[in-house]
UniProtKB/Swiss-Prot annotation:
Exoglycosidase that cleaves the single beta-linked mannose residue from the non-reducing end of beta-mannosidic oligosaccharides of various complexity and length. Involved in the degradation of polymeric mannan and galactomannan. The gene is mndA. PANTHER family: BETA-MANNOSIDASE, BETA-MANNOSIDASE A. One of its GO terms (biological process) is glycoprotein catabolic process. It is found in: Secreted. This is Beta-mannosidase A. It comes from Emericella nidulans (strain FGSC A4 / ATCC 38163 / CBS 112.46 / NRRL 194 / M139). It catalyses: Hydrolysis of terminal, non-reducing beta-D-mannose residues in beta-D-mannosides. Homodimer. GO terms for cellular component: extracellular region. Residues 1-21 form the signal peptide.
């Protein structure tokens, strides 16, 4: 985005490593943090960052609270030193001693035993330093000291160097010059998050001592599983046997004549699929590689969520020689092929009505599928406090939301293995990216060498995960930065284009191909695709760049439009092969605001609220003029389409406004998702919808569907609904009055069923003669396809009053889910009003809510009118979601809903169920909700 429970025998970690020697975790050693800006020393941790240690020491308050980001900017401007206590029991008689850092953020100087060991400048690399000689010269206990320089000050100094290149256009959020560092780019601010620019030893570190006999320690492993003969940009031959290529990166010395044993066991049963000594072993530098072909084995395939089972295997790689085992490592993996098809449309496809151009969709195990999902951003500014528990809740919500793919946006950070592990278990495909975003970047030799080390390490580290779906070069470089650069400096554009190709195509592409044959590569997140690939050429991929061919479609789309006058005009949505970004921002809930705002700041345009809104960004801290524009966009979206909250209680009114912005956001996304999914049966053959964005980095107005603490916004519930396997959708041209009803399915077989249509007035009474509309329509929809089941014009219907009418749509079908042997009953409900919600003559629905403690079921009933956007809300103090929410309810209908508790409550005696509330669109202007709000939020 740019600025404007598994089986008990499962291996839960990605790998288990054994080798010779000693391994001392530096997390078990005491640390201190100091700085001249602090004038004192505080206890510290590893892994950690300076902000977190200052918070734990009571030096600072919650960085996210109120205006603390402004007050705490001094931390980013200071240099910080982490110092360990003496490390016990390190012995000089070992063959060698190494300091290994899984991650240092970012500009660091490492000292050991008083000796300057190295300086680092890349947050995303693993570093291993031989400190053997320093240990032998140590006069006291071995101490590690890490000096971190201020990242903002460091890059500003680099920028001030006359030799540093300057580009005609660069996109800056709060802090400038982020493109000059290999550090999480959003640490300098983005339009959904703060600019804390943290520093520290953000990942684990340890000391390794290696013995004189067979001294080796495994640093990284590349496990590549693919079909024989596979090439990254070509479709795998599913008839070919599986190839397992295992490569180990190590420190130390291998003994003579090393060999590799590869053993594969099914995770659930422990059955051995294969156990083979590699036919050949290659030793290059400090990497040993072996390969084996499974000619007689047929592993169970791994499938994404809703497409089949997530079958997993443990692969154990053992390095040995004639006399002993040297090292053993176990990786959990799965057998699948994943391929990004960017090939030209074939004659067969043309004969099927698919428009000319090129494909842009994913295929898993040889089957094309519809990708449904969202974009993942860093879940916290401070990665060391991102826990497995939090990510488990988040990825469970992804699956519950009917999503099968997440795009891991750059530039945050490369995900830790445990998040890939969770995705492997749940069948969530992870489109992954290298950490470049919305900027041009240097291409000097030092920068490229630094990037090369980063790329190789991370590609190899995560390659064994079956959830890995793609490597993309960066975010919006081709689709945004190249056009902006050409517009700003057309005379020098060829130079900048060559720089783009040098980094993303000539450098990164070959590195990806050299380290994996199972994953496709795209130089940019949004692209028109390629014309040709020649791996022996200096620029091995020839990009298509901008396509001007009428009637042809190339590449994926990225769409943002903040002109709310056209938000629901689907004729202006982009028509393409795949939608990888689209969205609009909204406010989080009142409960979330209460985490970071004082009670007197709980109103729409308070300083705290506006400061926490980063759309649009302003360079520097505390500037709100651009932020106010983003607040105004949300306001206009509500005022144009929804009842305007007007509650005399200021906090109740604030809560209603927060919800109103979420209603607009959810409806806008719903409109687009339905449009893109319908495209699967249109000439564009559109096969992907990934909205912006899944979750929040902090508490503030953003594009997220899930708030910082895990609370679902309206968006996530609505997206879950329209991401169901088969849906019925209305498409209304509000200018002409034309109304079309479509059924869309992403199943792999055709499905048949019926759609029931019923016109009601807002009191819930059926309109005479169903307003001239049939009550039941049969349908058949093809595999991953759409079909129009009905069309009319609103002006031709017998509606007494378009402001008091609603069309309910109910679909039922019996169909085969992918890889399922028996048919499943599938249903979907939708509705349509021939007037926007603000113009409707709403009737008090008379909502009643009850709870059965025995069954754990909430029952909602509308007694006197149609309830639009029926919204169940739960109190602060726990995290979870309702099995249904934001639904339509008509009189006589009882909706039974359960609440899935993901975390809490801490007080086991708290009967939180009594504090669950329900409201609807009717309540947005009403004061009747005030009492329930007070109960839910603990207000007097």
């Amino acid at each position: 985005m740019h600025f404007h429970g598994i089986a008990t025998q499962a291996v839960l970690a990605s790998n288990i490593t054994t080798g010779s020697g000693r391994h001392v975790s530096l997390s078990d050693v005491k640390w201190t943090l100091s700085s001249s800006a602090l004038n004192s020393t505080v206890p510290a941790s590893l892994p950690s960052q300076a902000h977190l240690d200052l918070l734990n020491a009571g030096v600072i308050d919650d960085p996210y609270y109120g205006l603390n980001e402004i007050d705490l900017q001094w931390i980013a401007q200071a240099n910080w030193t982490y110092t360990s206590d003496p490390i016990p029991d390190l012995l000089e008689e070992y063959e060698s001693t190494w300091l290994v850092f899984e991650g240092l953020d970012t500009f660091a100087t490492v000292t050991f035993c008083g000796h300057n060991i190295a300086s680092t400048n890349n947050q995303f690399r693993q570093y291993a330093f031989d400190v053997s000689s320093a240990l032998k010269e140590c006069t006291g206990g071995p101490v590690v000291r890490i000096d971190f320089a201020s990242a903002p000050n460091t890059v500003d100094a680099i920028a001030a160097d006359p030799k540093t290149p300057v580009w005609p256009v660069q996109l800056t959020a709060q802090l400038p010059n982020r493109w000059l560092m290999r550090k999480q780019q959003s640490d300098f601010g983005w339009d959904w998050g703060p600019a804390f620019a943290p520093c520290g030893p953000w990942k684990p570190a340890y000391v390794v001592q290696l013995e004189k006999t067979a001294p080796i320690h495994v640093l990284n492993t590349d496990l590549d599983i693919y079909r024989q003969g596979n090439i990254n940009h070509l479709p795998p031959d599913q008839k070919q046997p599986w190839v397992v290529n295992a490569s180990i990166d190590f420190i130390g010395r291998l003994p003579a004549e090393p060999r590799l044993l590869i053993e594969i066991k099914e995770l659930e049963t422990g059955d051995v699929l294969a156990s083979q000594i590699s036919d050949s072993v290659t030793l290059i530098g400090t990497s040993i590689t072996g390969v084996t072909t499974l000619k007689d084995a047929s592993p169970k395939l791994w499938w994404p969520s809703s497409l089949g089972a997530q079958n997993l295997y443990n692969v154990t790689i053992t390095v040995f020689n004639k006399t002993e085992e040297v090292a053993r490592i176990t990786k959990r993996t799965g057998f699948r092929t994943i391929f990004l098809n960017q090939r030209n449309i074939t004659a067969t496809q043309l004969s099927q009505g698919i428009a000319p151009g090129a494909n842009w969709h994913f295929e898993v195990n040889g089957k094309e599928f519809y990708a449904k999902g969202s974009n993942f951003i860093p879940p916290d500014t401070f990665w060391p406090r991102v826990t497995k528990q939090k990510m488990t809740r988040l990825l469970d919500a992804v699956v519950a939301g009917n999503q099968n793919m997440l795009r891991i946006w750059s530039s945050g950070a490369y995900l830790p293995d445990f998040i890939y592990d969770l995705a492997d278990e749940r069948g969530i495909l992870l489109w992954s990216e290298f950490q470049f975003s919305d900027s041009m970047y240097p291409v000097d030799e030092d920068f490229l060498d630094n990037v090369a080390q980063e790329v190789v390490y991370n590609v190899r580290r995560v390659n064994h995960h079956p959830s890995l779906a793609l490597w993309a070069g960066g975010n919006e470089i081709e689709s945004l930065m190249l056009p902006l650069t050409r517009e700003a400096d057309p005379d020098n554009y060829p130079k900048y284009l060559a720089e783009y190709e040098k980094l993303y195509i000539s450098l990164i592409l070959p590195l990806v191909y050299e380290n994996t044959r199972s994953i496709s590569y795209s130089p940019s997140s949004t692209t028109e695709g390629y014309l040709s690939v020649n791996l022996s050429a200096p620029v091995p991929m020839t990009e298509r760049y901008e396509n001007d061919e009428p009637g042809a479609y190339y590449g994926d789309t990225d769409y943002y439009n903040y002109d709310t006058t056209v938000s629901f005009d689907y004729s202006i949505y982009p028509v393409g092969r795949f939608a990888n970004e689209f969205g609009f921002h909204s406010m989080p809930s009142l409960q979330t605001w209460q985490q970071v705002a004082d009670p007197e700041d709980l109103y729409f345009n308070s300083t705290t609220v506006v400061i926490h809104n980063r759309h649009y960004t302003s360079e520097g801290y505390g500037r709100i003029e651009n932020s106010s524009r983003g607040m105004a966009e949300m306001t206009l979206g509500v005022e144009r389409y929804y009842p305007i909250p007007d509650n005399p209680d200021s906090v109740a009114n604030f809560s209603a406004w927060c919800l109103a912005t979420q209603l607009f956001q959810a409806d806008f996304y719903k409109s687009q998702i339905q449009f893109y999914r319908r495209g699967s049966g249109m000439p564009e053959r559109q096969l992907g919808s990934l909205y912006w964005q899944l979750e929040d980095i902090w508490q503030g107005p953003t594009w997220a569907g899930i708030e910082y603490d895990g609370r679902w916004k309206v968006l996530h519930y609505v997206a879950r609904d329209v991401y169901q396997p088969i849906i019925v959708s209305p498409f209304w041209n509000y200018t002409t009055g034309d109304l079309e009803i479509y059924v869309t399915a992403d199943l792999w077989e055709s499905a048949a069923g019926t759609v029931n249509l019923k016109w009601l007035n807002l009191s819930g009474e059926q309109i005479i003669d169903n307003a001239g509309t049939p009550t039941e329509i049969p349908f058949t929809v093809g595999a991953i396809n759409t079909t129009k089941v009905y069309s009319t014009n609103i002006h031709d219907l017998n509606l007494p009053d378009t402001r008091a009418s609603i069309l309910t749509l109910s679909l039922s079908s019996q169909a085969n889910l992918p890889n399922a042997a028996v048919k499943t009953s599938l249903t979907h409900e939708n509705h349509f009003t021939p007037s926007f919600p603000k113009d409707l003559e709403l009737v008090n629905p008379g909502l009643e809510l009850s709870y059965d403690a025995h069954s754990g079921i909430f029952t909602v009933e509308a007694k006197s009118g149609v309830s639009l956007y029926t919204w169940l809300d739960y109190p602060a103090g726990l995290v979870g979601y309702f099995t249904e929410n934001a639904f339509l309810l008509v009189p006589g209908q009882k909706k039974k809903v359960q609440f899935v508790v993901q975390d809490g409550p801490k007080d086991q005696d708290w009967e939180w169920q009594s504090e669950v509330t329900v409201r609807s669109l009717w309540d947005q202007k009403s004061s009747t909700f005030l009492y329930a709000l007070r109960v839910a939020t603990g207000r007097p």
